[in-house]
């Protein structure tokens, strides 16, 4: 029987700590370390209360409609900062037509390349990369400057 759109759900704090996550959509969350800085969940902190929408494409070609919004609660006292989190949800791009947040987006051309995390990502030209990938050897050349702070040689077969 048809049970509706399978979504994933994520809640994280400004430090990137994930406090809740569920996935019926097959989104492969990173188990350790931070997630990709190009993913919409991180930019949602910069626009409090505004729904941010992104078509995110993983290196393996998996593509997801993602939407995220920051939420805050009252502080427990005047001396405490307000707790802020981002709530993110998404679904496989095949279900985008069933989700209102895809309205007006050309999902076939709007994809932003993201990775699970910098250490697991094979995207060589990422300007947001914070760490080199674990599976590839660094290409150190003091005379060359690329898009990414970490140039690397692809490991054969990976």
Q: What role is predicted for each listed range?
A:
Residues 1-158:
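Active-site hotspot residues in diverse enzymes, especially metal/ion-binding acidic/histidine motifs
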């Amino acid at each position: 029987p048809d049970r509706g759109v399978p979504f994933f759900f994520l809640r994280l704090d400004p430090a990137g700590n994930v406090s809740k996550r569920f996935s019926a959509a097959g989104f492969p969350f990173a188990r350790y370390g931070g997630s990709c800085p190009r993913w919409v969940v991180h930019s949602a902190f910069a626009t409090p209360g505004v729904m941010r929408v992104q078509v995110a494409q993983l290196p393996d070609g998996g593509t997801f409609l993602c939407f995220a919004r920051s939420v805050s609660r009252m502080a427990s006292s005047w001396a405490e900062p307000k707790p802020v989190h981002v709530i993110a949800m998404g679904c496989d791009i095949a279900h985008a037509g069933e989700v209102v947040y895809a309205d007006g987006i050309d999902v076939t051309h709007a994809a932003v390349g993201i990775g699970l995390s910098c250490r697991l990502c094979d995207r060589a030209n990422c300007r947001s990369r914070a760490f080199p990938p674990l599976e590839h050897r660094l290409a150190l050349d003091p005379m060359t400057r690329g898009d990414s702070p970490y140039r690397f040689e692809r490991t054969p077969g990976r």
